[in-house]
A protein has these predicted regions:
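Extracytoplasmic "Venus flytrap"
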Residues: 32, 38-44, 48-69, 94-101, ...
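Extracellular/periplasmic Venus flytrap/periplasmic-binding protein
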Residues: 105, 150, 157-267, 306-310, ...
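Extracellular/periplasmic periplasmic-binding protein-like sensory domains
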Residues: 264-335, 404-419
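Periplasmic-binding protein-like
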Residues: 49, 110-123, 142-144, 190-194, ...
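Short, low-complexity disordered leader/linker segments with a strong preference
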Residues: 1-46, 77, 417-420
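Beta-alpha junction/loop-to-helix N-cap segments that form part of ligand/metal-binding clefts
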Residues: 33-35, 59-63, 81-153, 162, ...
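Segments of small-molecule ligand-sensing domains
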Residues: 321, 327-328, 343-398
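Signal peptide-proximal N-terminal region
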Residues: 45, 67-91, 214-217
Length: 420
């Protein structure tokens, strides 16, 4: 992938448009339009973004749509798609309403409207349906947030995922806990694992168990629950307290993970830490406001935007300045997804979806989320360099703490729940 695509991540954020034009080695028309490197006459290139803009997940969905637009603006402010004569990138959004059926129909609509690629969708069930539509129509689909392993186990050729899948997050979460314990000099011999019993929670648990076995960590007790029905976690946390586990690991959504934290505050088990794994609460600013004692000391091993990356920080600042609220990691992943698509269009020099698909498969985009290297897709479409980072609530702020080379502050471990 060329230098121009890599630099786009900062374009429109740090005002690098003129530098980009010089570095790309080609003249760029700010107005867009012209003849492509393949002889196409193109003024605009349409891509589609599918997210829940209404419904219970609308807060995330709207942020993701906003970030997609910021990415498109950055590309266009840097001169558009140079290999297509400076053509403008145009974004059309689709509201999945948080349901797979609506997501499927919206994906079909966007493709019929001429979208040459899709990004989305925040929810695995919806992404599974969109992936099927993308495959049938041979239009590339880059998933920003969708953890379910099975989506990419269908032999699809047109679907790609940026984030780590659920089982990989479980594996990396266990490895991170073991490494943190070793680094701190505080042994962790036994972990209690509490997880929501759906496909996501089960996959995270299975990955965690496998990696914990390799690290010599006993996982016991293992407790599952129905995230849609649970209203109190006192019984489950009492079981954890009776087990003598050193650490409680939790893989759940926001509401149920908050219930677990409330039960920990009530039962007060003797723990070295509460350690979220791909957790939907413990790295969220809202958790600090909602949790007992502000959730002080809670960890989460999860994908997250990289606070040590200047371009990521610049995007976060631009987002808050533009929309009046802090950016969420889901939105940064959407920004990355659009940049991968834009870079592929640039590389392909074509609006042919199959040519764009081939360029996506060969991308080496440097993401703004924490990663083990440039985006690199395997034959299933999974980003093999997707990774997690450990966050911790410190002094009423979610802070990036481990591994040490990515830390914005030293971790605190042991960290008894609620202790300052």
């Amino acid at each position: 992938m060329n230098h121009r695509m890599r630099a786009w991540s900062g374009a429109g954020i740090a005002g690098l448009a003129l530098t980009l034009a010089a570095c790309s080695g080609s003249a760029v028309s700010a107005a867009g339009g012209g003849e492509s490197s393949t002889g196409e006459s193109v003024d605009e290139v349409l891509i589609g973004a599918l997210h829940p803009l209404t419904g219970s997940n609308a807060a995330d969905g709207q942020q993701m749509a906003n970030a997609a637009q910021l990415a498109v603006d950055a590309v266009n402010e840097a001169g558009g798609i140079a290999s297509l004569g400076g053509a403008d990138l145009v974004l059309e959004t689709g509201d999945t309403q948080g349901t797979p059926e609506t997501g499927q129909s919206e994906a079909t609509r966007l493709i019929e409207d001429g979208a040459v690629a899709l990004v989305g969708t925040f929810q695995s069930g919806t992404s599974a349906n969109v992936a099927s539509v993308a495959e049938r129509n041979q239009v590339p689909f880059v998933m920003d947030v969708s953890a379910l392993d099975e989506i990419l186990e269908q032999g699809y050729q047109y679907s790609f995922r940026l984030q780590p899948n659920a089982s990989l997050m479980g594996e990396q979460g266990a490895a991170a806990l073991a490494a943190l314990a070793e680094d701190s000099g505080t042994p962790v011999d036994q972990v209690a694992f509490l997880y929501e019993q759906g496909n996501y929670g089960a996959a995270v648990y299975e990955g965690f168990q496998a990696a914990a076995d390799e690290a010599g960590i006993t996982v016991d007790p293992v407790i599952s629950y129905d995230a849609t029905a649970v209203s109190d976690m006192t019984t489950q946390i009492s079981q954890v307290a009776a087990s003598g586990a050193d650490v409680l690991a939790v893989a759940g959504y926001y509401r149920d993970s908050l219930l677990a934290a409330q039960a920990v505050d009530t039962v007060k088990p003797d723990l070295q830490a509460v350690f979220g794994v791909a957790n939907g609460a413990y790295d969220q600013p809202a958790f600090v406001a909602d949790a007992p004692s502000g959730g002080e000391g809670y960890f989460d091993a999860n994908y997250h935007w990289d606070v040590t990356n200047p371009d990521a920080v610049a995007l976060a600042e631009l987002y808050e300045e533009t929309y009046g609220e802090p950016i969420r990691t889901s939105a940064v992943l959407t920004y990355d997804a659009v940049m991968v698509v834009a870079g592929a269009i640039e590389e392909a020099g074509s609006t042919d979806p199959t040519a764009i698909r081939d360029a996506i498969a060969d991308t080496d985009y440097e993401p703004l989320v924490v990663s083990q290297g440039p985006v690199s897709f395997d034959e299933t479409g999974q980003n093999t360099n997707a990774g997690i980072v450990v966050m911790q609530v410190q002094d009423a702020a979610v802070t990036q703490v481990f591994p040490n080379e990515l830390a914005e502050a030293p971790y605190r471990f042991p960290a008894a729940p609620g202790a300052s």
